[in-house]
Amino acid sequence: MNHISSRTFQVFCIATLLLCGGHAHRSFAQTPTPTPAAGPQFLSITVVSVKPGMNAEFQDFMKNTTNPALKKGGLMWREVWQSTAAGGDAFEYVMVSPVGKFAEYDGAGALEKGLGAQGFAAWQTKASSLVTSVHRFIVRTRNDLSFQRQPAGPHKLAVVTSIHVAPNRNSEFENYIKNDYMPVMKQAQVTYLVTQTIFGGDANEYVTLTMRDSFADLDKGPVLVQALGEEGAQKVLQKLPAGIVVHVERSLSRLVPELSFMPAQ
């Protein structure tokens, strides 16, 4: 992936996992344990870079035009995330929504259904005046590698780690996460979510989300160290076979509830 796609992909997966696992909504609630889902769960991720100076107009367009049309067109939910002031592109947004079946892409999307053909054409013209780039991905949530603690409410902050794995070593990496790393997150009762790119990006990239309630949580140090101490944390990290991970990036992202919508309860 190019520089922007790689960085934004980290953030998009944030939403990805969050949507699928970070809430207790009926449409995507998960159990507190990493029990595999009955079948693959796919998500559509749209990463948008807004033109400088157009942020307020973009948000207004999202709230008053885009979201109502998506709801009318049948989309059940969509979450929007943005990089935090602590790091990342302040003009970048990540939208996450469910993919029920790939056959959905054979016809008109929810936006076009909600606006009609002429309205959709007008929407495209307006949207193109507000953004500098748009990139779409489809990802698969990896419930078998994740732990979901039932939260008191929606997560507000995520530590997003993008991990590029060496070709043909995916199974080794997944075994490490499942058997060594994720159990520590479960022990610490910290939500830890994993996703994998299917279309639109690097198929050897995984994105993990460590959910936090506030920046103050970060002052407590890494979860592994909190749970096991320095020596114990190092022992877990040393179990990862050499050469599996070729690149790692880390960022912080926050939920933008005023631009998101959830299914009715």
Residue ranges with predicted function:
Residues A29-Q265:
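Short S/T/G/P-rich N-terminal loop/turn motif that feeds into the first structured element of a domain
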Residues M1, C20-G22, A86, G201:
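Intrinsic disorder/low-complexity signature
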Residues L17-S27:
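C-terminal segment of classical bacterial N-terminal signal peptides
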Residues T8-T16:
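Sec-dependent N-terminal signal peptides
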Residues T8-F9, G22, G39:
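Generic alpha-helix initiation/capping and coil-helix boundary signal
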Residues M1-R7:
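N-terminal secretory signal peptides that target proteins for export/translocation
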